[in-house]
Amino acid sequence: MGFFSKKVNYPELGADNPAAGQVQEVEQPLKDLMTQVSDPLEVIPSDGYAYVFIGKPPKKFGVAKIEEGQVQSFVAAAREKGLDQVKIQKLNEKFRDAYEQNMDAQRYTINVAGKEVVVTPCKELVQEVNQIMNSM
């Protein structure tokens, strides 16, 4: 890490880590997402799905869910459910709070399609994001 660099160097995610298999399950949709956004990605894997923080959480970011080979952004899901901008903003604040509460979670990096992606195998963060998504 350079003197002026804000990028954190996380250890590489080993193939023996269960999170590596979880990321592999969503690798193709993750690659598809990478062609649509140029922002950094942080994957929070779980069994059968993953959440992706897009951008630079906890400041400026978006959230997407990868499940059954599909990527759906939080904003798109919220609009489908008819939520207004005020409610969406409140839920975004909850995502920020959940992320900040889990800042100490172990993070790793993995190479996907030639790009470095951060992986955060944190069950607590998955549970909190699930609660927020289910509250829509």
What would you call each of these model-derived segments?
Residues 1-3:
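Membrane-inserting effector segments that mediate pore formation, membrane fusion
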Residues 5-65:
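N-terminal topogenic membrane-targeting module
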Residues 22, 26-29, 33, 90-94, ...:
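Charge-rich, solvent-exposed alpha-helical interaction surfaces
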Residues 32-36, 40, 98-101, 105, ...:
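Surface-exposed polar/charged interaction patches
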Residues 59-120:
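Intrinsically disordered, low-complexity regulatory segments enriched in Ser/Thr/Pro
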Residues 113-136:
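Glycine-rich, aromatic-bearing surface loops/beta-hairpins
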